[in-house]
From Swiss-Prot:
Homodimer which binds Holliday junction (HJ) DNA. The HJ becomes 2-fold symmetrical on binding to RuvC with unstacked arms; it has a different conformation from HJ DNA in complex with RuvA. In the full resolvosome a probable DNA-RuvA(4)-RuvB(12)-RuvC(2) complex forms which resolves the HJ. GO terms for molecular function: crossover junction DNA endonuclease activity; DNA binding; magnesium ion binding. PANTHER family: CROSSOVER JUNCTION ENDODEOXYRIBONUCLEASE RUVC. One of its GO terms (biological process) is DNA repair. It comes from Fusobacterium nucleatum subsp. nucleatum (strain ATCC 25586 / DSM 15643 / BCRC 10681 / CIP 101130 / JCM 8532 / KCTC 2640 / LMG 13131 / VPI 4355). Mg(2+) 1 binds at D7, D140. This is Crossover junction endodeoxyribonuclease RuvC.
Length: 190
């Protein structure tokens, strides 16, 4: 199973791609998509869309896990992240990829088992899960790998994060139908 994790943003989008087979995590690729603050919002979103679309076409993941929006003190920031998420989700839909979202709290719990884990603790667990000699850099790519691992781990556990729209109902490639988590797990076994 191949999963891409995405840490969305307008200036920096982190991505991480992991193959998971027989309880083994294998890194395929990770990195960031960067846009210049000197560009218009529309130009930045076009770059995010185009680059994520290229990554999806190159690596052909079966699933996309993307960080959900959370509380931002700055309304301008939340709007720009929401716009970036929108073009990333569009790229996923157009590439026929099943998608789901995780909040930062869900990722912390999914990686460390502790909702108040520090960024460094999460990065160390990503390093451990993936058997790396050092923590992946930059931070946005490490965050994307954490989102990816959270999704992989959620498929094999009965853990509920308390948000039915994330794990109990997952958008399937058609984009219009919803299936239960049990049906989703059965699809993975085929």
């Amino acid at each position: 199973m191949r999963v891409i994790g995405i840490d969305p943003g307008t200036a920096i989008v982190g991505y991480g791609i992991i193959d998971y087979d027989k309880n083994k995590y294998s890194i395929v690729d990770y990195g960031v998509v960067l846009t210049s603050k000197d560009l218009s919002t529309e130009e930045r979103l076009e770059i995010v869309y185009d680059e994520i679309d290229k990554i999806l076409k190159k690596y052909k993941p079966e699933f996309m896990a993307i960080e959900d929006l959370f509380y931002f003190k700055n309304n301008k920031t939340v709007i720009s992240v929401a716009q970036a998420r929108g073009v990333i989700l569009l790229a996923g839909k157009q590439n026929n990829i099943a998608m789901t979202s995780y909040t930062p709290l869900q990722v912390k719990i999914g990686i460390t088992g502790y909702g108040k884990a520090e960024k460094k603790q999460i990065q160390q667990m990503v390093q451990k899960f993936l058997g790396l000699s050092e923590i992946p850099k930059p931070d946005d790519a490490a965050d994307a790998l954490a989102i990816c691992i959270t999704h992989i781990n959620s498929l094999g556990s009965k853990l509920s994060f308390g948000r039915t729209n994330n794990l109990n109902k997952i958008v399937v490639p058609s984009g219009t139908n919803k299936i239960s988590l049990e049906e989703y797990k059965n699809l993975l076994k085929k």
